[in-house]
Amino acid sequence: PLSVMVNEEDHLRLQSLMSGLRLQEAWSLVDRLDEDLGRELPYAFHHEFGFLTSCPTNVGTGLRASVLMHLPGLVLTKEITKVLHGLSQVGLTFRGLYGEGSEVVGNFFQVSNQTTLGKTEEDLVDHLDRIVRQVIQYETHARQVLLRDARQVTEDKIWRAYGLLRYARSLTFEELMNLLSGVRLGTSLKLLPELRVYTLNKLMIFTQPAHLEQAAGRDLPPAESDSHRAAYVRRVLSTEGAVQSEGTGSAGNQTGEDPE
């Protein structure tokens, strides 16, 4: 879960990625590596401003802590704008699936600290962790509101998404992500009880253009890539077992894996 990028946005970028809300654990890994490198490399450091990074927005601690969250409940109940505005008021910001400059697809929001100056790394991580847990509570409540006030519409949206994924012959990546968002919501609400979050994560990763081209062993034009993507999704879902359309299960809280 640990990687180092050299001469990217800054001279060094140490990165730890983990599933679930494990910010402290991820930070500890990066911190240990940073200490080891710091004994060998002459980091540019100022007693007042902290680490002097190539990118001005990283000056200070140089730390960017992020959490990728799936927030369909807040989007569907039209509460997301209020929540995102609240994040900006407490020193956090949001980006799309691929980070800075990327669009939000599939109701995935990357929430991170906005500034790195004037606080310790521990303070930044603790603050993000605390606010993210509040957002999870808002999302959980929004999902229950959907079940209580718009259950039929919500179930229809979920099953339509599942049906398209099961039988579509062509899917763009954006279309896939939006459909997976509906199915992921259905899984967390126990409306699609036979599907695992692991499977949905797998579909998110291995249907991206480079993965499809690696599997095909050649470059794929967009239309052919969309066809390969749909075929891969059908194959994965068929091996997971068909979900019986009659049994929608009972409404429940989100799983421990969601939202992330």
Model-derived features: positions:
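Long, Pro/Ser/Thr-rich low-complexity/intrinsically disordered regulatory tracts in eukaryotic proteins
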Residues: 1-48, 63, 75-77, 81-260
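Conserved phosphate/anionic-ligand binding catalytic regions in large, soluble enzymes, centered on
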Residues: 50-67
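Alpha-helical support elements that line or immediately flank enzyme active sites
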Residues: 67-73
